[in-house]
């Protein structure tokens, strides 16, 4: 299967406003594929000969940065499709104004980003106020075995009481 591709690149720069735009995309793809339902196969068992021929077609796919896609077979017209819009990032890109600034000079983190970071911390199993188990058990009262009121204490050991039951 042979394939040819054509890429496009657009760039523009506005020095007055200090803006620049650059885009590159794969615009046109032309590929040769076997054509469905267009094949010929012959066999001659007496002469031990076979003949096989497969029809081919050229498929054209054209993409654009405006989310339009045209595709079809070359010479038969193209079908146009509108692709769905998809945001690439869930949040706007945030960069501090001064990268080398101290913590006091920096701008506050946006609220959306703070909430996202807090959620990631919670889902990651990290706890900000984490304490060691030994510190927690120091704060607890000592463990005392519970006895029922009115219950008699054993006077004999277990083995002695078993012998007494046997008689």
Curated annotation (Swiss-Prot):
Keywords: Cardiomyopathy, Cytoplasm, Disease variant, Limb-girdle muscular dystrophy, Phosphoprotein
Pfam families: Telethonin (PF09470)
Location (main, coarse): cytoplasm
MF (Gene Ontology): BMP binding; FATZ binding; molecular adaptor activity; protein-macromolecule adaptor activity; structural constituent of muscle; titin binding; titin Z domain binding; transmembrane transporter binding
Record carries keyword Nucleotide-binding: no
InterPro entries linked: Telethonin, Titin-like_dom_sf
Keyword Phosphoprotein (UniProt): yes
Bias kind Polar residues: ranges: 157-167
Disulfide feature: none
Expression sites (tissue/organ): Heart and skeletal muscle.
Gene: TCAP
Protein's name in the database: Telethonin
Associated pathology: Cardiomyopathy, familial hypertrophic, 25: A hereditary heart disorder characterized by ventricular hypertrophy, which is usually asymmetric and often involves the interventricular septum. The symptoms include dyspnea, syncope, collapse, palpitations, and chest pain. They can be readily provoked by exercise. The disorder has inter- and intrafamilial variability ranging from benign to malignant forms with high risk of cardiac failure and sudden cardiac death.
